[in-house]
Swiss-Prot record:
The lineage of its organism: Bacteria, Pseudomonadati, Pseudomonadota, Gammaproteobacteria, Enterobacterales. It is found in: Secreted; Host membrane. This is Secreted effector protein PipB. Effector proteins function to alter host cell physiology and promote bacterial survival in host tissues. Does not appear to be required for the formation or the maintenance of either Salmonella-containing vacuole (SCV) or the Salmonella-induced filaments (Sifs). Not required for intracellular replication in phagocytic cells. Residues 154-193, 199-238 form the Pentapeptide repeat domain.
């Protein structure tokens, strides 16, 4: 069930549409333990499982609003997120300290009448879900079933993002394969490690963006403005760069010869250090295009 309007209310409706059940099930789901389990599932899977989720509209409404004002660095430095009066409970989200051998974990505490239940979730997956909620709200993005992919990427697969303005956004580690970015503003955007396989990037503005290690396999970049873009170690297999502006771009460790077309491309002042050709039979790197 896609979200057609990414307001907090509609995000909630989407997340909780499957919820039905008895009074006993509702009581269990909205107990401190039930609320805690819902948060763990949500921040682990980027979605929810079928278990009376319609009772949590208030939770996501407050969470989405809170996240609009949360700074990642401040949160990881010790600032906490509080959600008050969720079925009589107070929820506290905080980042625990990293140990020598493990990354930090996000601690979820649910308190009611002086009793507290706690659990932990992976900090990277937690913040990716937060990033996705913020992007959906800010840019009114129509979203498929899961906020993040099975690999932990922000899930923008096949999404229509045409004519939007993402200037200066952090879009690192997104999976936007087969997405439509036509005439979108992506200048000064962080696209490090982004999966843009088979994406339509016709006439986009990518000036000054960081696309290090981005996967542009079979992407349509015709007439795009990529002046000053950092494409270090990016994958351009089968990409169409016809009439693309690449002046001043950093093209180190890439194989331009694998691009589908460079006709009319402007490479003035670009820095190109070629790399040995990869194995283009490897379909994990070079999947077949979907048209």
């Amino acid at each position: 069930m896609p979200i057609t309007n990414a307001s907090p209310e509609n995000i909630l409706r989407y997340l909780h549409a499957a919820g039905t059940g008895t009074k006993e099930a509702m009581k269990s789901a909205t107990s401190p333990r039930g609320i805690l389990e819902w948060f763990v599932n949500f921040f682990t899977c980027g979605g929810v499982r079928r278990s009376n989720e319609r009772w949590f509209r208030e939770v996501i409404g407050k969470l989405t609003t809170s996240l609009l004002y949360v700074n990642k660095n401040a949160f990881f430095d010790g600032n906490k997120i509080f959600l008050e009066d969720v079925n009589g409970c107070t929820i506290c989200l905080s980042c625990g300290a990293a140990s020598e051998n493990t990354d930090p974990m996000v601690i979820i505490e649910v308190n009611k009448n002086g009793k507290t239940v706690t659990d932990k979730v992976d900090s990277e997956r937690f913040w990716n879900v937060c990033r996705m909620l913020k992007l959906m709200s800010k840019h009114n993005i129509q979203q498929p079933d899961s906020l993040i992919t099975e690999d932990g990427f922000l899930n923008l697969r096949g999404v229509n993002l045409a004519h939007k303005d993402f200037q200066g956004e952090d879009l690192s580690k997104i999976d936007a394969s087969n997405a439509d970015f036509r005439e979108t503003t992506l200048s000064n955007v962080n696209l490090v490690g982004a999966n843009l396989c088979c994406a339509n990037l016709h006439a986009v503005n990518l000036m000054g963006s960081n696309m290090t290690k981005a996967n542009l396999t079979h992407a349509d970049l015709t007439c795009a403005n990529m002046s000053g873009v950092n494409l270090t170690a990016a994958i351009l297999f089968g990409s169409d760069l016809t009439d693309t502006k690449l002046n001043g771009a950093k093209l180190d460790k890439i194989a331009l010869t694998l691009a589908k077309a460079l006709t009319g491309a402007d490479l003035t002042g670009s820095q190109h250090t070629p790399t040995p050709l990869p194995d283009y039979n490897d379909r994990t790197l070079f999947p077949h295009p979907i048209f």
